[in-house]
């Protein structure tokens, strides 16, 4: 009875985290549309998260060795710095739902990598379902009513690039030092990524004058808020809180189940983008997103069932250490 209750609690925690992560993309979209550059939003999220995680890194500082640096730097540069920058850049060109569905096909290249590089095979049906997932993505991207001309090709390219960096993040996460613990594994590369962002967006170059500007939600509930509040959300409710929920949820349900539950994020993000931003999808796009989510969930279920070395995090954008998202 206790075990069942613990599992339900963990599932609820992971789903709540998915809701926060989905809303984070929407809030980031508002900040970008409000005048901040995508790279500035990414920098705020990373630096803010790094500051929140810094105390946990200090606690395990003595466990660090020089051998940990190469995989940690690679993870920070590709899995955090590049993926965050590319994801927010994607949001500047595409609707939130399309950005999420592009990123969430990451299990496909991960499975292919494990097949080609490690010889780890999935059941045949999983490879068939991969093709179905690609078809679903095609419907969601091109089904907006205007065909290819109605969607930003640049945005799609950024989305696919984000997906590749996310897949790389998952693969690299398996090489992060376990002796640092979950918070240490998440915090150390986050700090490295934050340092990289400080070179790209130095504090003196940040557009502080825009922070008091007012931005408006354009959905069913029009609301004006100061721009700075979106950044507070992105760091606290879009990063630190959901990440903590993921850690607590993973401990109860396991990373495999958390990964499956994480597939609710594109669906939640699509609905929330409609309500909050007024971003409408066509019936074809809705069908495409649902096909993609179900297909990727099937592939991920097969992957976590037959292959255990690399576990896909349950939500995006990446904050956690491969367990995440």
Predicted features and spans:
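C-terminal-most transmembrane helix of multi-pass membrane proteins
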Residues: 1-3, 12, 46, 227-229, ...
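Specific transmembrane alpha-helical segments of multi-pass solute transporters/efflux pumps
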Residues: 20-25, 54-103, 139, 235-253
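Hydrophobic alpha-helical transmembrane segments of multi-pass integral membrane proteins
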Residues: 8-12, 39-55, 74, 126-135, ...
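Hydrophobic transmembrane alpha-helices of multi-pass small-molecule transport proteins
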Residues: 53, 122-144, 284-303
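Helix-helix packing/entry segments at the starts of transmembrane helices
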Residues: 44, 84, 99-105, 172-195, ...
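Small-residue-rich packing faces within the transmembrane alpha-helices of Major Facilitator Superfamily
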Residues: 22-23, 47-51, 108, 134, ...
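Glycine-/small-residue-enriched transmembrane alpha-helix faces in small-molecule transporters
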Residues: 1-44, 148-175, 183, 199, ...
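Specific alpha-helical transmembrane segments that line the substrate/conduction pathway
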Residues: 40-51, 87-130, 162, 255-274
């Amino acid at each position: 009875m206790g075990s069942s209750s613990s599992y339900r609690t963990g599932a609820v925690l992971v789903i709540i985290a998915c809701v926060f992560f989905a809303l984070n993309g929407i809030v980031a979209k508002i900040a970008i549309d409000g005048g901040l550059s995508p790279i500035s939003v990414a920098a705020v999220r990373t630096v803010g998260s790094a500051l929140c995680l810094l105390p946990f890194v200090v606690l395990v500082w003595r466990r660090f060795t020089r051998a940990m640096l190469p995989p940690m730097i690679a993870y920070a540069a590709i899995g955090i710095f590049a993926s965050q920058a590319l994801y927010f850049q994607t949001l500047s060109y595409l609707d939130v739902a399309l950005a999420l569905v592009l990123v969430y096909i990451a299990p496909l290249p991960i499975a292919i990598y494990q097949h080609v590089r490690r010889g780890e095979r999935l059941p045949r049906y999983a490879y068939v379902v991969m093709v179905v997932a690609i078809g679903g993505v095609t419907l969601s991207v091109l089904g907006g009513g205007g065909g290819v001309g109605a969607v930003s090709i640049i945005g799609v390219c950024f989305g696919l690039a984000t997906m590749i960096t996310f897949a790389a993040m998952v693969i690299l996460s398996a090489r992060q030092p376990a002796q640092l613990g979950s918070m240490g594994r998440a915090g150390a590369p986050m700090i490295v990524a934050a340092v990289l962002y400080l070179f790209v967006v130095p504090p003196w170059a940040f557009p502080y004058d825009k922070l008091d500007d007012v931005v408006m939600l354009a959905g069913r509930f029009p609301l004006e808020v100061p721009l700075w509040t979106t950044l507070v959300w992105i760091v606290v409710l879009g990063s630190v809180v959901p990440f903590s929920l993921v850690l607590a949820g993973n401990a109860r349900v396991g990373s495999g189940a958390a990964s499956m539950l994480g597939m609710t994020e594109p669906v939640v993000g699509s609905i929330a983008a409609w309500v909050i931003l007024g971003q409408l999808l066509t019936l074809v796009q809705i069908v495409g997103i649902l096909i993609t989510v179900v297909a990727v969930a099937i592939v991920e279920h097969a992957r976590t069932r037959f292959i255990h070395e690399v576990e896909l995090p349950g939500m995006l954008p990446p904050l956690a250490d491969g367990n995440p998202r």
